[in-house]
Amino acid sequence: MLPIITKTKRRARAANLSQFFLMGLLFSTLVSRFPALKELYGLSIAELGFIPFAMSAGSLIATPICVFLSAKYGSRKVGMFCYLQTLSLCLFVLMPEKYMLFGVAVLYGALMELSDIAMNANSIIVEQAYKRPILGMFHSFFYFGMALGAVISIVTMQIGLSVTVHYVVMSVVAFIWFAINHVYYLKETPAKSAANQKFKILLP
């Protein structure tokens, strides 16, 4: 029987590998169906191109908040924003007006950034627990997830599955998937200096 500490580390590593895979799967699912979103809402090429721009803006806005929250509360707690990210995927196909998509894109970008930083921070804790470099393995699983997401999207397009059904089903699956992953995230105790730190934006 393996020692408890070894089981904990292995489960945390598996959970982080699974989480990187899931994040790649979600990202690939979203962008690979952009042509279907264009058709669903009657977007122009310029309007479609503004969606990834809005996502980037959301990520940029959220970055200093992510760093502050991770330092103050720890990556495991901040990682819970991924619940909202998984659910927000389906918002892309449920908006009554196309211009509301851009607000959804900003929100999704911000939530994706929060989830991503928390995931990376927790993977560093796992690497420290293993006392050997394993971050590269985590990041490789992101691209495996992207590859699977692309394959699934190709299949859904070939069988004529609507982007609405695709996104809603993926949102539900991803929500459950993350709930399982999050159970095995390693906990960390934030430093006292970080716990008492007030939010501020640091300029270069």
Task: Say what each PLM segment does.
Residues N16, F34, K38, L43-P52, ...:
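Juxtamembrane helix-start elements in MFS-like secondary transporters
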Residues I5-P35, E39, V106-A110, K200-P204:
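Pair of pore-lining "gating" transmembrane helices in MFS-fold secondary transporters
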Residues K77-L91:
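Structural signature of the two symmetry-related core transmembrane helices
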Residues V93-A105:
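Helix-loop junctions at membrane interfaces in 12-TM secondary transporters
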Residues T164-V183:
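Symmetry-related core transmembrane helices of the 12-TM Major Facilitator Superfamily/SLC fold
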Residues I61-G74, M157:
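Helix-to-loop junctions at the C-terminal end of transmembrane segments
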Residues V106-S140:
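Cytoplasmic helix-loop-helix junction between adjacent transmembrane helices
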Residues M55-A57, Y143-L148:
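Short hydrophobic/small-residue motifs within alpha-helical transmembrane segments
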